[in-house]
Amino acid sequence: MGIPAGDPEKGKKIFVQKCAQCHTIESGGKHKVGPNLYGVYGRKTGQAPGYSYTDANKGKGITWNKETLFEYLENPKKYIPGTKMVFAGLKKPQERADLIAYIEQASK
């Protein structure tokens, strides 16, 4: 099963509803409870400058892209056991695809 095409406008709504309480996604934005996600696309796990990651995040050693984000956002604690991200995940594949499309667009 492939990853569906995402709609960044729908993804922005999901980000505002489910992510923005803990994350920013703007160039030079401050970290909140979670790291600023600007530039996350193409970056290795646990690498946002100035954010205190768990050893689990730093040690995962993958690069964030459509495939890795799609799997992670379904169940973050399963994908990176020991992460401090408390969000349970997005079970619907289309919601994950929309959110990823927004993250990719907003973090360039």
UniProtKB/Swiss-Prot annotation:
Matching InterPro entries: Cyt_c-like_dom, Cyt_c-like_dom_sf, Cyt_c_1A/1B
Main location as per UniProt: mitochondrion
A Pfam family matched in the record: Cytochrom_C
Alphabetized UniProt keyword annotations: Electron transport, Heme, Iron, Metal-binding, Mitochondrion, Respiratory chain, Transport
Record family assignment: Belongs to the cytochrome c family.
Its job: Electron carrier protein. The oxidized form of the cytochrome c heme group can accept an electron from the heme group of the cytochrome c1 subunit of cytochrome reductase. Cytochrome c then transfers this electron to the cytochrome oxidase complex, the final protein carrier in the mitochondrial electron-transport chain.
Protein name, entry field: Cytochrome c
